[in-house]
């Protein structure tokens, strides 16, 4: 049996059940485990309640239960500079960002990894549902989590080979239901705790209200593609391509009673374009351009390959051909795709392996840019 006692693993503990079980499993496997709570955002609400304080209490309770030391580290400045400023800049540009991808790249697997190294870590571990596999040459492959419904490789697609070399994902082979069972069997303080959802710095707050604190909303016209005025929009940043709710149109303006969707934006004119029908022609495209192209292991600077891709979390894979030039790529779809959204991540897969991905800049239909920003 391998002696893991000389291998130090620093676990990012959020106060949730996944990271609690991560720490427990590593401790049971004999590793030298340290728990670290990351405070990335000052989320004190109007009543003076800070959920981070509650979460840290849960981390402390679990760490005491399983018998590991624990610390708290403050990354609020790094998070603001590297994640939140990016989030705001993307909204200013009319795009729909994915802060989770950037948080993993810049905070959980950069700032936190650097901090863990100062604690003498050999590895860091998190409660993500993903797997790492090492070959005989030492190359690390990132694979989808065994639980298809929970797989989080989409959000980890910007991790580098160097980051993956130092990372363990102890939950990757488990189903979420098994993780809960392990927590309950061990009597962990977080066993019954509800999973957090949504963007961490928004939490339970109203998204529109939150965003308007940082970006002034500019109302404008809502139009159909053929120029019919459909009323007023509240500010382009509040709408995403393919969105159905929150338009305030209803079926009364259309002859066919189909629901209305956001089908485009014109940032220069401050116009929101809407159209009827889930598969409205303005929502369909057959290729995209992406930048910040990044692979989880070494690849040539220029090459073309076929694979499957996701254009948003929780969607089935689609067959694509990818033409890579340095850190940019053209991605051509085998079948037309709906609501390809600038600012979101496109992530490439070869079977179970997550190859990497990039950020969507523009969608195209028959070579013409879609009016999405």
UniProtKB/Swiss-Prot annotation:
Binding site for ATP: 12-19, 38, 127
Major location category of this protein: cytoplasm
Entry keyword Transport: no
GO annotations of cellular component type: cytoplasm
tRNA processing found in the keyword field: yes
Any one of the GO BP annotations: tRNA wobble position uridine thiolation
Active site: 103, 200
Segments of this protein annotated with the region Interaction with tRNA: 150-152, 312-313
MF annotations from Gene Ontology: ATP binding; tRNA binding; tRNA-uridine 2-sulfurtransferase activity
Cell location: Cytoplasm
Disulfide pairings: 103-200
Site feature Interaction with tRNA, where: 128, 344
UniProt region (Interaction with target base in tRNA), positions on chain: 98-100
InterPro entries: MnmA-like, MnmA-like_C, MnmA-like_central, MnmA-like_central_sf, Rossmann-like_a/b/a_fold
PANTHER family reported for this sequence: MITOCHONDRIAL TRNA-SPECIFIC 2-THIOURIDYLASE 1, TRNA 5-METHYLAMINOMETHYL-2-THIOURIDYLATE -METHYLTRANSFERASE
Family per record: Belongs to the MnmA/TRMU family.
Function: Catalyzes the 2-thiolation of uridine at the wobble position (U34) of tRNA, leading to the formation of s(2)U34.
Name listed for the protein in its UniProt record: tRNA-specific 2-thiouridylase MnmA
Upper taxonomic lineage: Bacteria, Bacillati, Bacillota, Bacilli, Lactobacillales
Name of encoding gene: mnmA
